[in-house]
Amino acid sequence: FYSAMADVDKQQNVPLLEQVEEKKTKLPFCIFLLCNGAVGAGILTLTSAVGKVGWGMGLCLYVFFGVFAGFANMMLQKVFDYTKENTYSGIGKAIYGKWFEGFVEVIQFLYSIGTCCGYAIIIANELDLSVSFLTEGKEVPASLQFLTERSWLLVIATIFVILPPSLMRKITALRYTSIVAISGILYITIVMMYRAFTTHSCGLAEAANYVCDHAHCLIEANAMKANYTGFDECSLLCEGCEPDPVKSSLRSFIFNKDLFAVLPIFCFGHCSQVQFIPIVADMEKPTKKRVGTVVFFAYFLIFSLYVMNSMSGYFGFCGYSASNVLDSYPALDKLILVGRLIISFALCFTFPLYGYSVREAIVKMFHLQNTAYWKLALVTIVMVLSCMTVGIFFNDLSTVIGITGAIFGASLMAIIPSLLFFKWTKITDCKHKWWNYTLASFYLLLGLVMAVVGTVVTLVK
């Protein structure tokens, strides 16, 4: 009898375990998901960031932030193993209580808002340049002139493309647009490498068009709006001097206050901590070794993509790259135009994903689960229109990305993981507590420095 019962138990248990295992995500897909979680609109600002610190310092910062973000994820993995919570805010609640859960949700909420504002700026800029290409040499009727203006293009895209899917109750299908966005970034990277290989150092900057803004030469993709051709002419007539030797040549290391301005941009480009916890929770056999493998290869891919992209841009434009590297290339560049359209299309449908996350965060923070849907829709409309307004009045992507990375990126990557790791070390019987406290203190200190100094320098610039 007992033998028969044991056989029954065995038959019941084995299929159940196998069924759960089949639903888990395999290791290679986890690598792609984590890579996809970090790579986003921030990659477009990295060429400008490298141009401010030099290619050698840029490589050092890529290595540092890759290792820094990787160790932050491994700290979170230890806390995840202890709490078994499958969300970032969930492990915060398990370690510190409900107040810390609310704090994490607010940071994630503001981070999403900043990302959406960055998307709005990119969409507006790229649509503006795409339309200038399509209308080149053509007479636009006076009644349709507004369709060639950057602000109106963003308004139209927001109302007719971005807002409708943002108001959907469920937008699961839009999750696949991230694949389109990554494809667009890969395409842009290949084109940038091709353009770099077919010119000499700073060659693209020498042939680019410029405008004079407060006695500073700024690269202008639209030739119709430009005042000067080449940085030699612009420097003499706008700045009243010879071209800056630092900006007009390739430099390995540049030491000035701009270093503090680019730290938030590098931080933003490596932030994957929010996505990391759900990925590990859904991973097949999430042992320490397998999770470490995922983190290593994900950030190796991120490093490779960032280096190919930003170094190609820096080689061609040196220190003159626009804050969004796409805005450095001429509007009439057909190969870049394809990339502009792909990324604009993808971001228009990726934007609602963050809008949905913002709406869900508000529902959770204010306990609005049973609230009428029209009220939640109103919240979404206000959020989308607010980001659109930011996109209309700001066209400098590095400012939005800089502030978002400085305050919220530093919090998600360094400050929050360090606080969680502090408490985990205190309440568990882990070995080498002194090392854990030292590591957490380093992360907390550096996170606070990036948040404060990065924000101040970005706002001043």
Language-model segments: residues:
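Membrane-interfacial loop- and helix-cap regions that link adjacent transmembrane helices
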Residues: 6-18, 22-24, 28, 74, ...
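Extracellular loop-to-transmembrane helix junctions
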Residues: 47-85, 103
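C-terminal ends of transmembrane helices
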Residues: 163-171, 366-367
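Short, hydrophobic transmembrane alpha-helix segments
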Residues: 46-54, 171-172, 460-461
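Hydrophobic alpha-helical transmembrane segments
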Residues: 49, 164-168, 389-395
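The first (N-terminal) embedded transmembrane alpha-helix
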Residues: 25-44, 156-159, 267-272, 448-450
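Low-complexity, disordered terminal segments
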Residues: 1-2
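Central hydrophobic cores of alpha-helical transmembrane segments in multi-pass inner-membrane proteins
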Residues: 41, 66-75, 158-167, 417
